[in-house]
């Protein structure tokens, strides 16, 4: 079956198996997701589909190369969008949401607009395996999600921007630094950029040396020079503790003789 269907049905099955209903009212969420899956099955049975040219909020899916599982993602496509012309793609990485598992993520993407709404552009919301910080399988899911969108829509590959806030900001930092050739610009908000300072680890509590070495996989200051190849603009709230991520990266930029553009919201 198409991942456009199985991503939906899997999400409800997992919610049942793993106890991801947090109030009786959320039974209605499962019903809405299954109703949409049933509608799509009926369309495919008639040799039809309506999601490739739909505007507004669209939920699609693809099969992961990691484990062949159906993974959902959300799209926001402006009304009156011209599907015949190459368009910019904005990749928005979501923040942490402990209860926003597959089914709840899908329902959000069916019903709730996101944080950015650029004109004449598509916004994609990767799921990224829930709350993995867009690392490991979550990292690959973002890349495969972008690839899937690019295969099914006319995307101007020179104008793919990466953005995110909180945990999504952390994902934007490390995906931006690791894959700087994939993006036209990166906009990380809040989040975290490394391990040791973020968790306030004291020297006496450091783990084994090999664990510290493994931090290097995702500690973004190690890769800061990659970010010199594209516009990278951090943004933070003045009072938000997660301003720490941008401050760490400001120091990393300074160590290389560069300056990080950093927008700070006063009193926020």
Language-model segments: which ranges?
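Active-site machinery of serine-nucleophile hydrolases
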Residues: 85-153
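Hydrolases whose catalytic domains are alpha/beta-hydrolase-1, hotdog thioesterase
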Residues: 171-175
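Amphipathic, heptad-repeat alpha-helical segments
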Residues: 1-5
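Short beta-strand immediately N-terminal to the catalytic nucleophile in serine-hydrolase-like folds
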Residues: 162-164, 189, 235
